[in-house]
Amino acid sequence: MEKKRRTEIAEVGEFGLIDLLTKGFDPADASTLRAAGDDAAVVMPPSGEAVLCSTDALLEGIDFDLTYFPLRHLGYKAVTVAASDILAMNALPSQLMVSLGVSSKLSVEALQELYEGIAFACREQGIDLVGGDTKASMTGLVLGLTALGHAPKEKVVSRGGAQQNDLICISGNLGAAYMGLRLLEREKRVLADVKDPEPK
């Protein structure tokens, strides 16, 4: 059986890695004038629309566990987490910046898998990847996400704007993510016990 090649990040360098990961992320939103590959992104929302900006961070060991969370799924989740804040304010997410803190345990191939999930979610939601940064991390994988979106300023809603008798809607199954996490954590403990059995 042929062993998969593991490419260390040092072999391609920071800029080579960025080029490799952002290849194929062509801007689709009309408000994106310049995307990844320059010193800064350039965006121009439609006239009269407000720009919304939101930042999220995902930390290995806190927000996800790579023992049971595939990198492709993590990439998808990261985009969804970032976009949801923009959507919650009744705006359309249009651009995303992703900054990574990468530990030495991850290879170029692992990061490509992460970016496959990011690309899928961006295409699905019509979001352009317009930039980011990559640095070494001593504490595991760290994702920093900045989402931009736009909406007519009079249509933007905020948490503080809710009033009595307003209709409040939720989507998805309440508690399902928590229950799934509990099951995964249980399976992780079972696997650890099987891996390191104690003699009785």
Put a short name on every predicted segment.
Residues 1-200:
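Helix-biased detector of long, well-ordered alpha-helical tracts
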